[in-house]
Amino acid sequence: MSEQEVTYSTVRFHESSRLQKLVRTEEPQRPREACYREYSVPWKLIVIACGILCFLLLVTVALLAITIFQHSQQKHELQETLNCHDNCSPTQSDVNLKDELLRNKSIECRPGNDLLESLSRDQNRWYSETKTFSDSSQHTGVHERPISKAEGKGRGFEKYWFCYGIKCYYFNMDRKTWSGCKQTCQISSLSLLKIDNEDELKFLQNLAPSDISWIGLSYDNKKKDWVWIDNGPSKLALNTTKYNIRDGLCMSLSKTRLDNGDCDKSYICICGKRLDKFPH
């Protein structure tokens, strides 16, 4: 009986200890649940507050970025305005530099200006020695110069010369061969006329006599080409292919065209010379 009691008592003790443990383990759970419930409400408030704060920070950063962008744009526009002002408004140094360049340029141009003044004086001097030979010529600047007896050689042939621009022209109405006209021009320290360009050709055709006149263009058999008497260059564009050298090796001028013919024929002589080639 005693062993059974001990055994029984042992079993009861063991069960009671388990019950006590169960009771002990169950007792602290209630305050934990209460504690969790107590702390869960403030944590949600903190999260909401942090979210609002982050949103405000994002809005602030966005506003700052927009402000900085606008400021940079305004600064860029201001810089462009200043650059344009600097480029468009000459500074004092630029003005001084331009003045210096103008002074240097005027010094460089003085020889040319002196030459132009000299030519102008020569032209005025030649014009002062001339007289108008026709009413129509008054609008063209054409003037006739009286021919001396020595120049006319007493033959009474009509002669006149006129200056236009930088060139002077001498018309000798005494008909001569091409070689005779060349010699006549050389006696007067002139040369048979060389036409420099198309404008001069048209001008001479309007004022030339109705008769054909010899000019200083002839065919060179050695060069196989048409050359001017002084071998100088000319900007006059000539279609030399249309001139058949069998018709003649010397060129003449009429009111309508240039034409080649027999050099032994007798035509009017046209001499010419530039004003800057006359002796002072």
From Swiss-Prot:
Q: Which residues form the C-type lectin domain?
A: 156-275
Q: What does this protein do?
A: Receptor on natural killer (NK) cells for class I MHC.
Q: What cellular-component terms does GO give this entry?
A: external side of plasma membrane; plasma membrane
Protein's cellular compartments: Membrane
The record's annotation in PROSITE patterns points to: C_TYPE_LECTIN_2
Its assembly, as annotated, is:
Homodimer; disulfide-linked.
Disulfide bridge positions per record = 163-168, 181-269, 185-271, 250-263
Q: Which GO terms describe its biological process?
A: cell adhesion
Q: Can you tell me which residues are glycosylated? A: 104, 239
Provide Cytoplasmic-side residue ranges: 1-44
- Annotated membrane topology: Single-pass type II membrane protein
The UniProt keyword set, sorted, is:
Cell adhesion, Disulfide bond, Glycoprotein, Lectin, Membrane, Receptor, Signal-anchor, Transmembrane, Transmembrane helix
Which superkingdom is the protein from?
A: Eukaryota
Read off the PANTHER family from this record. KILLER CELL LECTIN-LIKE RECEPTOR 2, KILLER CELL LECTIN-LIKE RECEPTOR 4-RELATED
Q: Which InterPro entries match?
A: C-type_lectin-like (IPR001304), C-type_lectin-like/link_sf (IPR016186), CTDL_fold (IPR016187), Ly49_N (IPR013600), Mouse_KLRs (IPR052013), NKR-like_CTLD (IPR033992)
Intervals, Extracellular compartment: 67-280
Name of the protein described by the UniProt record: Killer cell lectin-like receptor 7
Q: Any stretches that span the bilayer, and where are they?
A: 45-66
Q: Which Gene3D superfamilies does its entry note?
A: Mannose-Binding Protein A, subunit A
Listed GO MF terms = carbohydrate binding
Query: Which SMART domains does this entry report, sorted A to Z?
Result: CLECT (SM00034)
